[in-house]
Amino acid sequence: MKNINPTQTSAWQALQKHYDEMKDVTIAELFANDSDRFAKFSATFDDLMLVDFSKNRITEETLAKLQDLAKETDLAGAIKSMFSGEKINRTEDRAVLHVALRNRSNTPIIVDGKDVMPEVNAVLEKMKTFSQAIISGQWKGYTGKAITDVVNIGIGGSDLGPFMVTEALRPYKNHLNMHFVSNVDGTHIAEVLKKVNPETTLFLVASKTFTTQETMTNAHSARDWFLKTAGDEKHVAKHFAALSTNVKAVGEFGIDTANMFEFWDWVGGRYSLWSAIGLSIILSVGFDNFVELLSGAHAMDKHFSTTPTEKNLPILLALIGIWYNNFFGAETEAILPYDQYMHRFAAYLQQGNMESNGKYVDRNGNAVDYQTGPIIWGEPGTNGQHAFYQLIHQGTKMVPCDFIAPAITHNPLSDHHQKLLSNFFAQTEALAFGKSREVVEQEYRDQGKDPAQLEHVVPFKVFEGNRPTNSILLREITPFSLGALIALYEHKIFTQGVILNIFTFDQWGVELGKQLANRILPELGDDKAISSHDSSTNGLINRYKAWRA
């Protein structure tokens, strides 16, 4: 990968000039001037996903200039580097190969002179055998009963991805009850343990190193709870499995290392749902559906790695995002899935994007003087319409939005889905075109009211419009289409990181807080007043000690 400061490219300079020409152009004008705008600014993936980016403040010239930026920053070379197993995570000297985990074509992918695919396939086969034993009831707990509940204990990528996918694919789930515990707050594990029976519960401990503070604290509490009933430590092996690489620590915990599922240092946490970390997904929806999830992602991987830039969906979405973030000064992006099963999708992408591209140092080690990753947030529609859409429609901040919806619902109840989709279509239209003062006044006339007498209200009912959106319409949310959708966003994030000259696959920003927490923890063990920190931290700790006494 080349380290190129994007602001020093001729494409960036051209985009700055172009922004001056575009900043006052409205989406309404762009549609009025081009009856084919939708056809030109939308694309379909595999007849499963329609991506409409026509309601953006862009022209063909905008996209051409953004594509020039991708060329000048050698995006094509970076894509080749990632897919070929080059160690593009240079701060940790690691390859970045979540694409290998879903490489259904099974073509060799070489890291350090070795094809990783045989090991990937071996772990998949092991997961298949294990999951079939659990799901079929062949696997018995210590009292001879089949497993009914699975508790996944992990945090970050070991929780957000599997939790999001198992929720999104609930229509495909089997009889097993899935639970996810992440927070070190004892309330999280305590509330889950109230719902399960030690005789019929399987715990998955998801920690690559088997040292993650939150995960191991919860795992030990789960083990203690289990042994209060089971008694004999040898029973732990029937009720705990590990998603880890630390054979010694897993064995010491009491887990049979035959039930330890490995993954590799070239799998980043927030890209790990495709790996052994996805075992909870398999236990929820079955191995065949997990393979479909992998296959959908692999199809998007092929699209991303082989499709020209001008038709490449992850690249186009990434470029449009850079346009708003760096030229219009937009600080956030809203992810708005119109599907209740997708209620964890925004939280998943929040980590995927913000932990990847929330960096202020470029790949040369210098502080950047441009914007990097945006703030990602969102909630399912239509809930968000009754919460924060007010600001998106009439606030002073530009919030580019991605609207996501399936054409076919898994729950065709009455006319619920038509009502949901009518809102999905209406919101992007309203955000793009708004409502003028003239229309507001005419509405009053149509109601037999005199606008002059309502002058004090009229300004508040005007919508400026010109708020940009992308619409992603899926035929249906299936394991395959969900896999493709997740991979679409993964590659969008990667593309932005390449162009912005930052390292997308490390996360040093999570370390400092952990270090300080480890230093503070022993200080909380007694009632002595603390004076070793700044006055604020000392004051907070000392008040905590006083109140807990």
Curated annotation (Swiss-Prot):
Q: Where in the cell is it found?
A: Cytoplasm
Q: Which UniProt keywords apply?
A: Cytoplasm, Gluconeogenesis, Glycolysis, Isomerase
**Which residues does UniProt mark as catalytic?**
355 (proton donor), 386, 514
Which Gene3D superfamilies does this chain map to?
A: 1.10.1390.10, Glucose-6-phosphate isomerase like protein, domain 1 (3.40.50.10490)
Can you cite a GO biological process for this protein? glucose 6-phosphate metabolic process
Question: What PROSITE patterns does this protein map onto?
Answer: P_GLUCOSE_ISOMERASE_1, P_GLUCOSE_ISOMERASE_2, P_GLUCOSE_ISOMERASE_3
Query: According to its UniProt record, which reaction does this protein catalyse?
Result: alpha-D-glucose 6-phosphate = beta-D-fructose 6-phosphate
The answer to whether the entry has keyword Isomerase is yes
Any one annotated GO CC term = cytosol
Q: Name one GO molecular function term.
A: glucose-6-phosphate isomerase activity
Pathway(s) annotated for this protein in UniProt: Carbohydrate biosynthesis; gluconeogenesis; Carbohydrate degradation; glycolysis; D-glyceraldehyde 3-phosphate and glycerone phosphate from D-glucose: step 2/4
Assigned EC number: 5.3.1.9
One Pfam short name: PGI
Briefly, what is this protein's role?
Answer: Catalyzes the reversible isomerization of glucose-6-phosphate to fructose-6-phosphate.
Question: Family, per the entry?
Answer: Belongs to the GPI family.
- Alphabetical list of HAMAP family matching this protein: G6P_isomerase
| Name of the molecule in the record | Glucose-6-phosphate isomerase
Q: What is the protein's species of origin?
A: Salmonella choleraesuis (strain SC-B67)
Q: What is the lineage of its organism?
A: Bacteria, Pseudomonadati, Pseudomonadota, Gammaproteobacteria, Enterobacterales
